[in-house]
């Protein structure tokens, strides 16, 4: 009833309020879609969220705003903004603006009205009525010696007026909560009721409102009246609020009118004024709360959690696809739990690495259980689809190996003969290299599809990996072979058998380098790795370094410690490692490897595969020693001879690229007291350098979210691991000191280097995107294709999952940005009617990105930019998709995602 009457509004609507730096757009779309679905199933269509509510994340991404716009939202409100940015916006009434979130999608599809709130999401000073606060309650009994209504209302009015002065309308929003507030919600609301009734408490309140109003463009301001963990005694809080509203509105001569409201009502009041608004086209990273507190540490905190989340998404997508393609029944609950586990992982204190250790452990446990159950789904689906389940023994089962990141798989290690099934979740054929941990020294591999014996190479598992604490594997080698032309949404199966011959493992060679026609890779006298491009004037030196984390008492800015949130190096440069290691080289027909040891706890394997154009850096860091009582933050640096003029590029949540310029912000004059951490940005998928004169490009792709920068021209720096001994006092309450099996945590990960001269941009960028997508392959154990035909190389099936009432949710996306390629950046049309091999489409409905509203019914508020804004040429609205003469054509423009709900007719497997 409350929702249907508009008295209770659902905002945000995702499974959690996600982080915006370390999350991938694929997981963001998923967790909003599932949250919307549960809201609709529970409350009906009136509960459909229309407002983005990102009040606590530590910086805001442009892609997040773009996704909100594509979900049909009317606007977005957030709480945290860089202190210098906020000062300028307050002084210029620019706290509210139109965020132009995608130059590719344009105004109609990606512009989003955005409000930066005055006091994050907390109440005005002196007006927190929660049991966690000590602010004076509202006492309106005139016979009480503690009567304070007149004074308290004066205070409140001053605050409201101050806030309103910074905004462009007469509407402001006052937040009235905070961390851990509302534990006694009745008490909190009792005081809020009094505040609203009584506003000298009233004059204070009015003064605050006037202060806030000066920062905003209209005469509407929003006053938030809560905080974390507030409203635990709601009656007390609302009792005070009722008084505050009552006495404020009764005040003679007051220009402030206070009402209970919602974010949507607030935006509606602004929209009704038909004003023009300033615009913004970049993002809000990095976020600093003071001159020495740059919230860039969490870009890299808890790197194993970040990797595990990415692996979880890969497995979830494979599970959903296989359930759809095989029409598998009775697994709704398992998928539901998996979706929800992944939704929790997107939280701004989950994948960010800013939770306590025991909470991180619990998140990982929940995700592991979901992935383990997903293994059963995958096994059942593959068995059904391939026919192996019915044609083999009842004990048929496919095992998923969740410890391949430490080169461990119990099934392959203990079996002399086994089958490996490789599933391709992409929309076109791919070839990839498979690595299977084994104990033996000689193996043969045969394709079960065409009987071909691919070339096999046996390489040793690096010594550092074999010594990882807690690794119980007996595998000492890996079988490496190329799985060629795995069909789109399809599988290939390989039989792997141990041979009698022994001693065929690749042995270290006396060569001092590895090379192919593109690269020559060696180790220099300093122990750094050098990469030389054979046919181009391009060189890279790759090295490892560490920062000493600052330690202080956190009582003032200058004494801030480096911690889970904050990256603050003690010194102005990273320290070099003393090279005490060595290297070994292994060459074979499939892969060449350089095993490079820096010291006892830093090493890597550098690989070039026979038919690939990238270089793979498989790094291993830890346990980071802290017996010297010094916290350390480990980075790798790729130093090139490119001339980059302070400029580099990073992705936004794995999607569009943003230009970054060292020591610069596009919208204010930056004063930088922390030149290292203040130049760090989130790297979800890729960081890029360009030499415009030479037309050379260097890309580093990552396998998890990391913090990165270009601190010198031609350099890329990425943070791999952090171990710190002091908390930064921003909420975790413990140092970021991860341990496992009684030692410091060991982290293993991969970077993919791809670069060279850009001649044919289509070919260059397509190779790069294929590499990024192949990192999503879930290497499991399989013989058919879910597609009758491959999609064009610039089109990807983002979502294929079972939906409601036997329908299917399908998303198609265009992978290229405008101007990123030549032919590949053009609009592309695909016919999806006979695309899928296991079903045909009987009806199709297009929805907003969140799949909770028909696209034709979505009519978001329209907002006008200021006259000095550059108006983009708007193309015609997207074509309606339907079935015409047994054809379903879908037109995709650059960076466009289109979402459909399908009813289908199944075909026999």
Residues covered by each model-derived region:
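Catalytic-domain carbohydrate-binding cleft regions of carbohydrate-active enzymes
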Residues: 1-419, 425, 432, 441, ...
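Terminal connector regions
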Residues: 342, 497-524, 528-531, 537, ...
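Flexible, active-site-proximal loop/turn residues at the rims of small-molecule/cofactor binding pockets
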Residues: 58, 82, 498, 850, ...
């Amino acid at each position: 009833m409350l929702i249907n009457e508009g008295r209770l509004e659902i905002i945000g609507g995702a499974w959690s309020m996600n982080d915006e730096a370390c999350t991938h757009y694929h997981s963001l779309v998923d967790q909003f879609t599932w949250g919307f679905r549960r809201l609709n199933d529970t409350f009906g269509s009136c509960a459909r969220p229309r407002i983005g509510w990102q009040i606590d994340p530590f910086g805001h991404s442009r892609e997040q705003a773009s996704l909100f716009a594509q979900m049909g939202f009317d606007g977005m409100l957030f709480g945290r903004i860089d202190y210098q940015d906020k000062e300028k916006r307050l002084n210029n009434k620019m706290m509210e603006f139109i965020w132009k979130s995608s130059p590719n999608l344009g105004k109609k599809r990606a512009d989003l009205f955005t409000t930066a709130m005055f006091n994050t999401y907390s109440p005005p000073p002196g007006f927190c009525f929660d049991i966690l606060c000590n602010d004076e309650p509202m006492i309106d009994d005139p016979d009480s010696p503690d009567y304070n209504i007149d004074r308290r209302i004066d205070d409140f009015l001053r605050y409201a007026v101050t806030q309103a002065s910074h905004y462009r309308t007469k509407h402001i929003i006052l937040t009235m909560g905070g961390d851990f507030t509302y534990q006694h919600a009745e008490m909190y609301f009792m005081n809020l009721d009094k505040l609203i009734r009584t506003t000298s408490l009233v004059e204070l309140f009015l003064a605050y409102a006037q202060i806030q109003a000066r920062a905003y463009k209209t005469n509407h301001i929003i006053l938030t009246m809560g905080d974390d963990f507030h409203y635990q005694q709601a009656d007390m809080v609302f009792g005070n609020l009722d008084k505050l509203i009552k006495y404020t509105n009764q005040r003679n001569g007051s220009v402030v009118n206070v009402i209970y409201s919602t974010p949507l009502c607030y935006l509606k009041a602004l929209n009704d004024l038909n004003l023009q608004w300033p615009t913004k086209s970049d993002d809000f990273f990095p976020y600093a709360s003071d001159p020495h507190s740059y919230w860039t540490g969490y870009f890299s905190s808890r790197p194993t959690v970040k990797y595990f989340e990415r692996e979880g998404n890969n497995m979830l997508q494979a599970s959903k696809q296989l359930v759809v393609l095989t029409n598998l029944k009775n697994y709704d609950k398992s998928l539901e739990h998996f979706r929800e586990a992944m939704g929790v992982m997107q939280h701004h204190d989950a994948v960010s690495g800013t939770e306590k250790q025991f909470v991180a452990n619990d998140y990982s446990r929940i995700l592991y259980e979901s992935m383990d159950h997903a293994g059963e789904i995958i096994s059942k689906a593959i068995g059904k689809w391939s026919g192996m389940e019915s044609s083999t023994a009842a004990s048929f089962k496919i095992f998923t190996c969740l410890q391949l990141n430490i080169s461990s798989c119990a099934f392959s290690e203990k079996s002399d003969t086994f089958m490996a099934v490789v599933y391709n979740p992409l929309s076109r054929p791919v070839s990839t290299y498979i690595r299977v941990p084994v104990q033996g020294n000689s193996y043969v591999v045969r394709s079960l599809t065409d009987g071909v014996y691919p070339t096999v190479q046996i390489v040793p598992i690096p010594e550092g990996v074999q010594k990882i604490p807690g690794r119980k594997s007996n595998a000492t080698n890996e079988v490496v072979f190329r799985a060629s032309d795995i069909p789109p949404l399809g599988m290939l199966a390989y039989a792997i058998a141990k041979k009698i011959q022994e001693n065929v493992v690749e042995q270290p060679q006396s060569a001092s380098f590895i090379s192919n026609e593109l690269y020559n890779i060696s180790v220099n006298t300093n122990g750094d790795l050098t990469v030389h491009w054979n046919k181009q004037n391009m060189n890279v030196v790759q090295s490892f370094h560490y920062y000493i984390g600052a330690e202080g008492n956190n009582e003032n800015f200058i004494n801030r410690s480096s911690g889970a949130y904050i990256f603050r190096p003690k010194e102005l440069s990273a320290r070099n490692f003393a090279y005490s290691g060595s290297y070994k080289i292994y060459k074979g027909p499939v892969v060449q490897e350089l095993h490079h040891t820096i010291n006892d706890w830093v090493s890597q394997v550098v690989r070039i595969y026979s038919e690939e154009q990238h270089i793979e850096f498989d790094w291993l860091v830890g346990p980071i020693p802290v017996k010297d009582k010094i916290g350390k933050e480990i980075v790798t640096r790729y130093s090139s001879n490119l001339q980059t003029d302070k400029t580099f590029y990073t992705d936004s949540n794995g999607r569009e690229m943003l230009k970054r310029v060292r020591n610069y912000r596009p919208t204010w004059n930056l004063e930088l007291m922390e030149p290292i951490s203040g130049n760090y940005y989130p790297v979800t998928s890729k960081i890029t350098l360009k030499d415009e004169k030479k037309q050379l490009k260097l890309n580093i792709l990552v396998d998890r979210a990391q913090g990165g920068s270009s601190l010198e021209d031609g350099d890329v720096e990425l943070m791999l691991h952090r171990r710190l001994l002091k908390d930064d006092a921003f909420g975790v309450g413990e140092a970021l000191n991860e341990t496992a099996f009684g030692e410091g945590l060991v982290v293993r990960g991969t970077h993919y280097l791809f670069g060279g001269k850009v001649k044919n941009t289509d070919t260059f960028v397509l190779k790069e995107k294929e590499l990024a997508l192949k990192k999503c392959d879930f290497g499991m154990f399989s013989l058919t294709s879910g597609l009758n035909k491959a999609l064009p190389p610039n089109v990807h099936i983002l979502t294929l999952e079972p939906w409601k009432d036997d329908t299917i949710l399908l998303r198609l996306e265009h992978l290229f940005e405008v101007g990123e390629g030549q032919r590949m950046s053009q609009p592309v049309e695909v016919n999806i009617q006979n695309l899928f091999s296991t079903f045909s489409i009987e009806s199709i409905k297009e929805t907003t990105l969140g799949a909770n509203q028909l696209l034709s019914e979505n009519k978001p508020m329209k907002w006008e930019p200021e006259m000095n804004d550059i108006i983009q040429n708007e193309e015609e609205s997207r074509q309606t998709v339907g079935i015409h003469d047994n054809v379903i054509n879908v037109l995709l423009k650059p960076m466009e995602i289109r979402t459909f709900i399908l009813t289908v007719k199944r075909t026999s497997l």
